Amino acid sequence: MKNSQKSILAIGGIGILVFVSAFGGIFLTRNLGKTAKTVNMEEASAVIERYAKKIGATQAEVIKSAVELADTQVDELPDIDKNEVTIQPVTKLYAEIFSTYEKCGKGKNGWMNEVAEKFNQAGYEVDGQPVSVMIRNVASGLGMDYISTGKYVPDGYSPSNDFWGKMLLADGIFMEEISSGLVNNTAGILLSKDTQEKLTKRYGSINLKTIVEATAGGEFAMGYTNPNASATGLNFLISTLQTYNAKEPLSEESVEGFQAFQTNVPFVAYTTEQMSKAAETGSLDGFIMEYQTYINDPGLTRKYQFTPFGFLHTNPLYTTRDT
């Protein structure tokens, strides 16, 4: 009996040793032939999997890009060097002009750059001193903020329309109008051809009121530019308010109407330049833009239809007190 017990214990002990040896061998050799990177990835994946089991996900409500129409403070303005100088002066005595993208951008949007270059090459003098000009690309509203806060005041200012100059004058800031309009431009809404066809079929015609109502109803994805910075955006804001109440655009009816529209706007660009780049992705059914930018872009004219709205963009030119 004792011998049988000893035999059973011996066999059991041998079995345990064999199991331990086998398991130990597998454990010690599990990473043989694998690189350190592979081993680390496997270990990391295992850790992530353990944590992932403890995480629960919920679907958040989508928040649209509402714009707060608050006053701009001087400390919120970017350093002036963040705004590109598109034409450098060639003399010690020069005048700096704030201009907008559609005048000092690239290609056909850079006609003011071409004029400035020719001026700088002409060798003009004032009181016997050689003079030149510097052009800086600054959005209409941002330029007004620099001037009104006094953070940076240029010698000349050419926004896309005269709203900005009128606001500066209304605030008691000296501005002398050199030209009421350097060149005329038109604000408009671009709609994809499918969207244009769909809205025409539903509403009978395409106009600002139709587009605003369709956007407020969530019928298509519309983008617009920030009215604090963009002349086209400000034009759109004023024109939209007037579609609800032409006599009192700041009435409760108008404000509520615009808020309903804005709730269904998925994208607000800071400037027309940003809107133009965003349009290249094809993610928007409609957005606002000036005609000059639209007509000079074959990609836009091929995909979208232009519907004009609002006030004329005359591109005035002002000088400031320091000039």
Q: What is the predicted role of each segment?
A:
Residues 236-239:
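Extended alpha-helical scaffolding regions
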Residues 2-16:
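N-terminal Sec-pathway targeting helices
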Residues 23-37:
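Hydrophobic single-pass membrane-insertion segments
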Residues 194-203, 229-230, 242-250, 322-323:
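Short helix-loop capping/hinge motifs at secondary-structure junctions, enriched
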Residues 242-306:
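Ligand-binding pocket segment of bilobal, Venus flytrap-like solute-binding proteins
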Residues 12, 33-229:
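N-terminal segment of the mature folded domain
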